[in-house]
């Protein structure tokens, strides 16, 4: 496996949070100079590939994979899609976690699920079921997420206390490996 493919995989899994140069150096065990060469190579790969919808950006000293700007109108239309579309299993999982654990950060959601949740979380925000609810007072000040009044309406309840008590739900332990 090449450093380029490892770099791409790490940035994909990091999602909207991205990864700093220091984190990438540590994870890939490369020198900063060698890593910068790989970042430049990946950036060039995306620029030249007209079939790819992604590009590599550096924002606030953090590297992220994002969609190309020319796709913004399509993605805005997607984000405005009516809620009557069925929510994916991932979106339902994230919505459940936010409902029961709010306020909660995306990283905390990821830790519970064991996979990156940024896509599902973005979809829930776009649908108006979840909203940013401040910043957590820790290093990096990540966004906190909570459900909205629309979530309550959508679920047909008036208060979060009306949600089913999760301790009464039998959970089937299942171990899975993502990688």
Curated annotation (Swiss-Prot):
A GO CC annotation given for this chain: cytoplasm
- Which compartments is it annotated to reside in? Cytoplasm
Asked if the Swiss-Prot or TrEMBL record annotates the protein with the keyword DNA-binding, the reply is no
- Which superkingdom? Bacteria
Where is the major localization of this protein? cytoplasm
Task: Identify the InterPro entries for this entry.
Answer: ScpB_csome_segregation (IPR005234), WH-like_DNA-bd_sf (IPR036388), WH_DNA-bd_sf (IPR036390)
Q: What is the similarity comment for this entry?
A: Belongs to the ScpB family.
The name this protein goes by in its record:
Segregation and condensation protein B
């Amino acid at each position: 496996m090449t450093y380029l493919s490892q770099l791409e995989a790490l940035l994909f899994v990091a999602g909207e949070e991205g990864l700093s140069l220091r984190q990438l150096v540590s994870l890939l065990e490369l020198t900063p100079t060698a890593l910068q060469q790989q970042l430049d190579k990946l950036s060039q790969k995306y620029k030249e590939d007209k079939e790819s919808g992604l590009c590599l950006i550096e924002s606030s000293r953090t590297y992220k994979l994002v969609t190309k700007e020319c796709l913004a109108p399509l993605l805005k239309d997607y984000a405005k899609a009516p809620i009557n579309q069925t929510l994916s299993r991932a979106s339902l999982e994230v919505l459940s976690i936010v409902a029961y654990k709010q306020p909660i950060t995306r990283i905390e959601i990821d830790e519970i699920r064991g996979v990156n949740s940024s896509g599902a979380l973005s979809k829930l925000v776009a649908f108006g079921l979840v909203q940013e609810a401040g910043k957590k007072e820790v290093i990096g000040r990540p966004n906190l997420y909570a459900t909205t009044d629309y979530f309550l309406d959508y679920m047909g309840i008036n208060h979060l206390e009306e949600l089913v008590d999760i301790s009464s739900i039998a959970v089937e332990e299942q171990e899975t490996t993502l990688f």
